[in-house]
Amino acid sequence: MSASSILDLVREDLRAFAGYSSARTSALQGDVWLNANESAWANPADPDASTRRYPDPQPKGLRSALAALYGCAPEQLLIGRGSDEAIDLLVRGLCVPERDAVLVTPPVFGMYAVCARLQNAPLVDVPLVDGPDGFHADIPAIVAMALSSNAKLVFLCSPSNPAGSAIALDQIEQALQALQGKALVVVDEAYGEFSDVPSAVGLLGRYDNLAVLRTLSKAHALAAARIGTLIANAELIALLRRCQAPYPVPTPCAAMAEQALSAPALEVTRRRIAEVRSERERMHKALVQLPGVRQVYPSQGNFLLVRFDDAEGAFQALLEAGVVVRDQRAVPRLADALRITLGTNEQNQRVLSALQRTQEAAA
């Protein structure tokens, strides 16, 4: 797909959309700023006056740091309020209500479906296949359904939440090739740092119908800062930026995120990722040995999806031990499952101890 034709996937009424021109988007220079109706005084709660001015819509330092981290050009990258905002922008920007479908692969992160329904875009499901080695995406079925349903967006969560499985790059490439000119393939790599599968960002040079979602919420421990990243064709990024709210990145959050991407902070993050991966292996081995545990799915994320003979009993036992996990029982095909985030060694041991006590009491 050429750089110009990627915009053919965008809603016709938005292709020439100029968006809102904020005071910060103008290139004017000066030392007395009276163009945005901001206060001339700092709030007493803000002694450094760091939040008196509206923020840079796309902070240049942070954008450059994120581009270096993810291996793309800054102009291929949009910063938003978590990946949630990027998902919403994609659905609103590409899907005509009641016409252009959004394809998802349940069980999967729920925001894709939420954004589709808010846009009144048809939602198409191609469920993950639950095989002997865990859940996996059926790429031929996904492609066939995307083509037959007029899907404009195909969301591939890799590693998948809550299933934990990742999609090999050659499979993603199959989807990209088959859907060129038809749909944008969005690879959500929120848990990519924990995975053995390389990032799909490396495919951007060959496929303009690819978008990749990344976040600082998981491996980088900045969930409350709400720093999400959309990586895609530069023209598509520029257009979606015009559809975005004027000031999506608060200055304190941008400053914290940029500091988190410094060399010393990244080294700490790398060590913590290694610890999570080690704990993931340990917990998997320990959980499969527990009576009452029916199945522990392989995971490329920072969590494990576990099926229980008595999921309610396991859930309540963990709560009584002060441990809160994600109840998946309302999700189709996961009526006996809990998702357990991998914490510290001590936290994970509390999980094992609580589940062990439950089985001993039931014996």
Swiss-Prot record:
This is Histidinol-phosphate aminotransferase. Its cofactor is pyridoxal 5'-phosphate. CDD domains: AAT_like (cd00609). Homodimer. It catalyses: L-histidinol phosphate + 2-oxoglutarate = 3-(imidazol-4-yl)-2-oxopropyl phosphate + L-glutamate. The modification N6-(pyridoxal phosphate)lysine is found at K218. Belongs to the class-II pyridoxal-phosphate-dependent aminotransferase family. Histidinol-phosphate aminotransferase subfamily. It is an enzyme of class 2 (transferase). It comes from Xanthomonas axonopodis pv. citri (strain 306). Its EC number is 2.6.1.9. GO terms for molecular function: histidinol-phosphate transaminase activity; pyridoxal phosphate binding. GO terms for biological process: L-histidine biosynthetic process. Pathway: Amino-acid biosynthesis; L-histidine biosynthesis; L-histidine from 5-phospho-alpha-D-ribose 1-diphosphate: step 7/9. PANTHER family: HISTIDINOL-PHOSPHATE AMINOTRANSFERASE (PTHR42885:SF2), HISTIDINOL-PHOSPHATE AMINOTRANSFERASE-RELATED (PTHR42885).
